[in-house]
Each structure stands twice: as C-alpha cells, then as structure tokens.
Amino acid sequence: STAVIIQTDSGGTGNGDIFVNSAVTWAANKLTLSAYGNININADLNATSTASLALNYGLGAPALDNTSQITTTNAAANLAGTASYTTTQGSDGVEKAYTVITTLDQLQGMSSNVAANYVLGSNIDAAATSTWNLSTGFAPILGFAGTFDGLGHTISDLFMSKGATGSIGLIGSTGVGSVIRNVGLVGGSVSGGASTGALVGSNATGTVYNSY
C-alpha cells in the first residue's frame, strides 16, 4: 500500500468533520486523516506491521482554545506494537508523537515518563494486577501531564487496593494540560480514600472525555 491522505476543508455544507464509517486495514506506509473539524471513528482502523496513522484535526482554527476532538464510537484504532501514531490539533499546532501500548507492563511503565504521550494499540487484560505489589495491585500513575488516548480500547479487570490517603486510580492524578480520552475500564476493583476513581483519582487541571 502507498501513503494515503484524506482531507476536509471549509467548503460545502458540512462542518469539515471526517467520519470513518467503514473498516480500513493497511500494513505499511501512513494513513493521514486531516480534518477541518473533528475526527469521528465509527469503524475499526487496523494498522498492522509497520503501518502508521496520523490524525490531524481542528485545522480550521489555531491551536489555542481549539475545541475540536478525536472520538471513537463502538470502534477502535488497532495499532501494532511496531506501528506509529501522531496527532496535530489546530492550524498552527505542534505534532505529538505517541508511544504505542499493547501490554500490561507497558501500561504500568507510563509512570516512568508522565510528560509523554501514550496510545492503546489494543485492549489490555489487567487481571494479573491482583497479585502485584504484595496484592495491592497496579501502582497509580501520578502527575500525568501528557495525552493518553485509548482510541476505543478497554482495560479489563484492573485491581487496586490502597490505603485511605493519596490519589488512587489508573491515572492517580493529572498535571496541567493532560488529556485522557477514548478509553474504557471494564470489570476489576479499585479502592482507596477520598481521591479515588477507577480511571482518574484526582483531576484538577486535566481534560477527560469519551471515557468510562
């Protein structure tokens, strides 16, 4: 396959959004979706082998105060561990590169660089966390200041059993400018004190959308 670019602009009667309504699979080169407005993924995107995906959105306005979104609805973008993923928001936005996560250990590894950007390339089975850290489970990712994009994937059976203090959740606490989107938690058990939530324990400055 060769590189493909799909682009919308301000012409016509629509809002310049891109809708993915049929599944697409490719194994090499880059698929770029460049939307004047939002990108809505309603059918699976499957980037296998060395394929890459670039989602550029909100290009009809500058990055500052840009409210455009990437959303998934009953679909996911599946990325091989060798695939690459980038996003750019706004006409003058800076491209963000992401680390692709396909394993539970990689998910926990987000704690090593909380300013980076991460994307789920597949669903994650987190059942093994019930025996981690003397059976207290997954260690919360604290002070997360990057972007975490589930791209329609889920994390199942996450286990955390912590004390009554601290910020407890997959993302224990957020930093300025953080974005968490398009990810779901299914099953599992998360317990702690007042600042506890399965997905985010304490969110004072971040943005969370299309997630559960």
Predicted regions and their residues:
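Surface-exposed repetitive/solenoidal architectures
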Residues: 1-212
